[in-house]
């Protein structure tokens, strides 16, 4: 795992610390109409339960702004105190001024320099939001997006570039514009009185190589806390892979303090998928541990039986279900490693390397399944109840190994 290239400022968002030596924070965003309090609260609760440590909500009109305090109140009634970030575009200055209770209830404001205001109004409207943030002691994310980049700034940089003897490519100018927009806005916010430890910045694009290039340069040019994410990752496998590759490379280099995976959900798919992907990225990089990991083989001609796949699914589902109570009872259980293997080739070796593992018989092998605990063979299972018996062994292992807090 890489070490931080630059020690960033630490920003407190509600009860969550972002930056410095703090763990990378998982974020998500709702897709409900914020004024629908019931649906919005339900989705925030689901995202938080899935592991989102900060949740962003759209605040795009007066009904949404008016609903924010009620949303926070309803969440508290469910004993949920996850920090909420208000996502503002175009009219944030108006909504925050007109609805001061909204400004107080939110834990952070997101401002887009590309649409906070246009022409002479840009600086004035940006300043209005910053002053409200200062008055309410709130942090701000200055979130630049290449789909809504400040066109006046881009035109200025293009003109300057055209006058150079060795001009940059259009792609390089786009990268420069993203970074310049973020850093000039952050500098202006500081000039207005917002402390550096109240500022998080992001420069989001939709292509993997562009994101990597922009953040590598950004990390060298500033010590603000950085929010990572592709702006539109896409749907399904494409979105997951693009996010894992881009965020994984940057995080491994020590760049990034908080992440969000902007997946397009499949029809009727749970919004929580983006949280699961964030957690898997961080856990597979060895940066954080959230739930016991299950190592399992993909199957081959030696494993003609589907039983090992079924057992793997049962074990993973059982661990995911139990973690809601285990994390309160058993300290360190989230780092447990379980192996479910399908034949003798790699089964015993992987099982020995896990905290607890089972090596199922492959085609033509003796119909027995040795169980290894802490590297040593501890049980031999056979018959029709291997799944139930192995899960019971896992349960007992957790109780004996991790004990109660």
Curated annotation (Swiss-Prot):
UniProt GO molecular function: 4 iron, 4 sulfur cluster binding; 4-hydroxy-3-methylbut-2-en-1-yl diphosphate synthase activity (ferredoxin); 4-hydroxy-3-methylbut-2-enyl-diphosphate synthase activity (flavodoxin); iron ion binding
InterPro entries: Dihydropteroate_synth-like_sf, IspG_bac, IspG_bac-typ, NO2/SO3_Rdtase_4Fe4S_sf
CC cofactor: [4Fe-4S] cluster
Domain of life: Bacteria
GO biological process, one term: isopentenyl diphosphate biosynthetic process, methylerythritol 4-phosphate pathway
Pfam families, sorted: GcpE (PF04551)
Binding-site residues, [4Fe-4S] cluster: 297, 300, 343, 350
Catalyzed reaction equations: (2E)-4-hydroxy-3-methylbut-2-enyl diphosphate + oxidized [flavodoxin] + H2O + 2 H(+) = 2-C-methyl-D-erythritol 2,4-cyclic diphosphate + reduced [flavodoxin]
Keyword hit for Iron-sulfur: yes
EC assignment: 1.17.7.3
Entry keyword annotation includes Metal-binding: yes
Recorded metabolic or biological pathway in which this protein acts: Isoprenoid biosynthesis; isopentenyl diphosphate biosynthesis via DXP pathway; isopentenyl diphosphate from 1-deoxy-D-xylulose 5-phosphate: step 5/6
Top-level class of the enzyme under EC nomenclature: oxidoreductase
Keywords, comma-separated and alphabetical: 4Fe-4S, Iron, Iron-sulfur, Isoprene biosynthesis, Metal-binding, Oxidoreductase
Cofactor note: Binds 1 [4Fe-4S] cluster.
Protein role: Converts 2C-methyl-D-erythritol 2,4-cyclodiphosphate (ME-2,4cPP) into 1-hydroxy-2-methyl-2-(E)-butenyl 4-diphosphate.
Family: Belongs to the IspG family.
Protein name, UniProt field: 4-hydroxy-3-methylbut-2-en-1-yl diphosphate synthase (flavodoxin)
Lineage: Bacteria, Pseudomonadati, Pseudomonadota, Gammaproteobacteria, Thiotrichales
